[in-house]
């Protein structure tokens, strides 16, 4: 009932809550999850490919290769998979979407480091400097279009 008393919002909504117990001390365990929205049973064939899923980089790419999403954690050594080479100078999230034949990059400094002025990406050998939002906009996404 978080919306109780607020105009134009429902008092309550149904949400998904999920708890998965991996035990007290899992060692060298690997797992991944896919959450689908909507009604019905999803296709057994995933609409994406997991490029990497470890403690340094998590990345997926759509089956049609028009969308790539990656999370780079501290100490990461970049991503080399699925015909893609992508590295980031700082921990961040990166989305690359193909739009009208151009690569559109959306980058977020998830750490909200106010001192961070830019994140440098290396994408298939090309260096891209993405200025990070400053001041009150720190933590917002920044976009860059590669012609």
Which residue ranges define each predicted feature?
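Short beta-strand micro-motifs in enzyme catalytic cores
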Residues: 14-16, 29-31, 58, 103
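Non-catalytic terminal regions with compositionally biased, polar/charged low complexity
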Residues: 36-147
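A structural signal for short secondary-structure junctions
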Residues: 10-12, 24-28, 99-100, 112-113
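Beta-strand/loop-rich accessory regions of lumenal/periplasmic or secreted enzymes
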Residues: 1-25
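Short Pro-Gly-centered flexible turn/kink motifs
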Residues: 26-37
